[in-house]
Each structure stands twice: as structure tokens, then as C-alpha cells.
Amino acid sequence: MTITPQNLIALLPLLIVGLTVVVVMLSIAWRRNHFLNATLSVIGLNAALVSLWFVGQAGAMDVTPLMRVDGFAMLYTGLVLLASLATCTFAYPWLEGYNDNKDEFYLLVLIAALGGILLANANHLASLFLGIELISLPLFGLVGYAFRQKRSLEASIKYTILSAAASSFLLFGMALVYAQSGDLSFVALGKNLGDGMLNEPLLLAGFGLMIVGLGFKLSLVPFHLWTPDVYQGAPAPVSTFLATASKIAIFGVVMRLFLYAPVGDSEAIRVVLAIIAFASIIFGNLMALSQTNIKRLLGYSSISHLGYLLVALIALQTGEMSMEAVGVYLAGYLFSSLGAFGVVSLMSSPYRGPDADSLFSYRGLFWHRPILAAVMTVMMLSLAGIPMTLGFIGKFYVLAVGVQAHLWWLVGAVVVGSAIGLYYYLRVAVSLYLHAPEQPGRDAPSNWQYSAGGIVVLISALLVLVLGVWPQPLISIVRLAMPLM
């Protein structure tokens, strides 16, 4: 197979991020300079984002048997790059107070971003597995980056061991699917899995094991046990990446698998996914009710958000609207999570031991950092799905898709879950406006809005509000990603 200039243009984001990894590695070997390496990383990620315009001009194509570049891949690549950029900008002030090696942080984020881009373009079970490993392995190091803290190290060990187990399930499931179908390409799977084939025990077992592996990576019930501990133990900028980039990339590739291979046509698989979605929505919200740690609360709430997205995935067979729903919901979830975790990162910067993540640290924040408190309020309202925010548009889409596909009990679960979610999100928002404690705890720097992280947080809040009132630009972008399938 010959690689043409057209193919190289299609692979630009992947090549640019890969080149940035090499440049940052050489820069660290040459001389440790925190500012230089952070700047190189941000320039590389921005260049990869800009290159998406050229990719769009090249059109949709299968670059290799493992990768397909089209509108869908571009949308998810863009979301992963935005999340990686935000992670780097939040990490810079946080690392300023960190006494050990700072520069490797950016290297690990870039390698994980590379895995995310590979997942967005994956068109084959081999590239799906490679992408998941490429995004997971750097996260083992990132979660335990504050290794002098017992909690961070414990979170890293938990995540490493459980992630390895999940990967083995995923790989074994792929082996069974291959044994039955004789191919690993998504398109070939779609052709080979004809009538009645999906009821073969070996194939059902294979897809079942794959659901276990992917369910762990997406922290769906009952494979979610690592989520709250890892979110709490990981440094705040890493929790940002975990909650956004890794979830978006993996959900994107699962979406593509379901589009090409008729996995959702099997009644057994649909029932299993529906039960997982129902349990994730209800359990995630109920567990978040009693949390007094913001990162744990956001960890449990992410379980329920993935449950909502699963409703749209189950309804995928009913039409293109569910693809639109997932795109809009993930964009809303990305900006809301970036804002919420960004506030936690700003409150925890520079590094001074554990993050400012207890609810008590945010009590009365409005009285000395009013804009920051307003941003956090907007993010909580968006995550709760209150009208006039982007979170509401996403949730409305999911409900519409559920109704269209007659998934009545899942629609009921979404409504009940949203009602429960409203309580704990508003609890965080209300605590920002209570009387400040006598002895103030951690606080964001007074000039936070002029820092790169502060600007990212403000832009996220602005996007959540503007797109919540006028979502048409976002819907148009998501629709552009559809016809190129």
C-alpha cells in the first residue's frame, strides 16, 4: 500500500502530536525548562487543532485498513485535542509548586492525546485496542504524578491493576469475535455478521467480554468501582483529562463500531446494555448524593452521564438523530467538565499537597472570588441539565432519541436521574454563596482570570451559556460529521 500526500494530510493531527512528543522528549533530554516544554506542548496541540481544517479539505478516506478519516473522526479528534489543551493549561500553574520533575507531565498528556486521536480514527478492532492502551498507559503515570501523597499513589495502583484486567477481557472478547467472524475490521464485521449470526454463543460471549472491557474504561456500572477513588486521588488537571478526553475518545470508537457492525441488532446485547444504562444512571446519581468531596461527586456523576449517553447508543438503530444526540451531549459534557475541574485546578494551584476538593473549601467562595463562583455555578447548572445551558440541550436530545426509539423505562430513568442530580449539583452551587468560614482555607490566586487556565475556564462558561441559548452552530458542526460516514 502506497502512502500518498493526500493520506499524509488526512493524518496531520496524528503526525503533529507524534512529532510534538519527540520534540518535547528531546527538549527534556537537552535541558529541563518547565515553561519551554509546556509552551512546546501547547503549540503542538494547537497546530494539530488547526490542521483539522486541512483534513476537512482532503475529504473522507480509508488511510490504512486500521484507520478511517472522515467528519466523525474529525469531530472526536477536535474534542480530544481541546480536552488535552485544557489539561496542559490547568497543569502549568499546578506544577509551579511541584518539587519533583515537572516536564514529564506534558509528555504523558501528549502520548495519551495520541491514543485519543487514534481511537477517533479507528476502523478496526486492532486500532481500537492500540488506541485504548495508548490512552491508558500514560494515565497510570499521570494519576500517580503526586506520588508523595498516599492517595495519589493508591489511585494509580488501583487504576493500573483494574485497567490491566479490563484490557485482558477486551482482548479475549476480540479473539472470540475473530474466531467466529474471521475478520477484525468494523466494515467486514458488518458484512460477516448476517442474519442469525449474532445469536451464535461464541459471538455473544465475545461481545459480552468486550462490553466488560469497554464498560470499565467508560466507568459504567458494575465496572465503575475505580472511578471515585481515582478521580479523588489523581491531581485535579489529570481528573480533567480522565473525565473528558479518555471518555470521549472511547465512546466515539464504540459509536463507530455500533454503526458499522450490527451489534445493536442482537436483542440479548441490547437488553444487557439497557440494564447497564439504567443501573449507571440510578446508581451514579444516588451515590453522588452523599459526597462531600467535589472530585468524588464529579466522579459518580460521570457514571450517570455515560449512562445517559448509553441510551442514545442503544437507540442508534432508529436513525441519525441518536448520533447527533451523542455529539451534542459530549460537547456539552466536555465544556461543563472542563469548567468544573478547571475551577478545582485553579483552587488547588500551585501544588501544596492535597487538592482543594472538599465542599467546605468552596463555602462562601462568592464573597472573595465572585466571578469564579459564578463560573462554577454555571457548570453545575449545565451538568444538572437546567434550561439555557448546553447541558440541557444535550439531555433534551437524549430524551427525544429515547422517546423516538420507545425506550420508555430508560427515558423514565433519565428523568428520575436528572431530578436526583439537580439536588447534589445545586448543593455545590448553594455552598458557594453561604457565609465564608472564619478561617479561610485554600483559595485561587487573585489574578486567576488572567492566567491561561482562567481564560480556558471563562471561555468554557461562555460557550456553555451561549450554545445553551443558541445551539445551532454546534448542531451544524455535529451534523457535518454525519454524512461522511
From Swiss-Prot:
- Tell me, which GO biological process terms does this entry list? aerobic respiration; ATP synthesis coupled electron transport; electron transport coupled proton transport; respiratory electron transport chain
Per the record, the domain of life is: Bacteria
Q: Reported effect of changing residue 217 to R?
A: Shows 40% of the wild-type rate of deamino-NADH oxidase
Which parts of the sequence lie on the Periplasmic side of the lipid bilayer?
1-7, 56-70, 126, 180-202, 256-270, 318-325, 394-407, 476-485
What is the E.C. number? 7.1.1.-
The UniProt keyword set, sorted, is: Cell inner membrane, Cell membrane, Membrane, NAD, Quinone, Translocase, Transmembrane, Transmembrane helix, Transport, Ubiquinone
Compartment(s) of residence: Cell inner membrane
The reported effect of residue 224 to K is: Shows 40% of the wild-type rate of deamino-NADH oxidase. Inhibited by 20-30% upon addition of 0.25 mM of decylubiquinone
Question: What is the stated purpose of this protein?
Answer: NDH-1 shuttles electrons from NADH, via FMN and iron-sulfur (Fe-S) centers, to quinones in the respiratory chain. The immediate electron acceptor for the enzyme in this species is believed to be ubiquinone. Couples the redox reaction to proton translocation (for every two electrons transferred, four hydrogen ions are translocated across the cytoplasmic membrane), and thus conserves the redox energy in a proton gradient.
Q: Which InterPro entries match?
A: NADH-Q_OxRdtase_suN/2, ND/Mrp_TM
Report any Pfam family annotated for this entry.
Proton_antipo_M
Q: Has UniProt tagged this entry with the keyword Membrane? A: yes
Q: Which family does it belong to?
A: Belongs to the complex I subunit 2 family.
The kind of enzyme this is, by top-level EC class, is: translocase
Ranges facing Cytoplasmic side: 29-34, 92-104, 148-158, 224-234, 292-296, 347-372, 431-454
Protein name according to UniProt = NADH-quinone oxidoreductase subunit N
**Transmembrane intervals:** 8-28, 35-55, 71-91, 105-125, 127-147, 159-179, 203-223, 235-255, 271-291, 297-317, 326-346, 373-393, 408-430, 455-475
Q: What is the effect of changing residue 1 to H?
A: Shows 20% of the wild-type rate of deamino-NADH oxidase
What binding partners and quaternary form does the record give? NDH-1 is composed of 13 different subunits. Subunits NuoA, H, J, K, L, M, N constitute the membrane sector of the complex.
Q: Name one GO cellular component term.
A: membrane
The membrane-topology field of this record reads: Multi-pass membrane protein
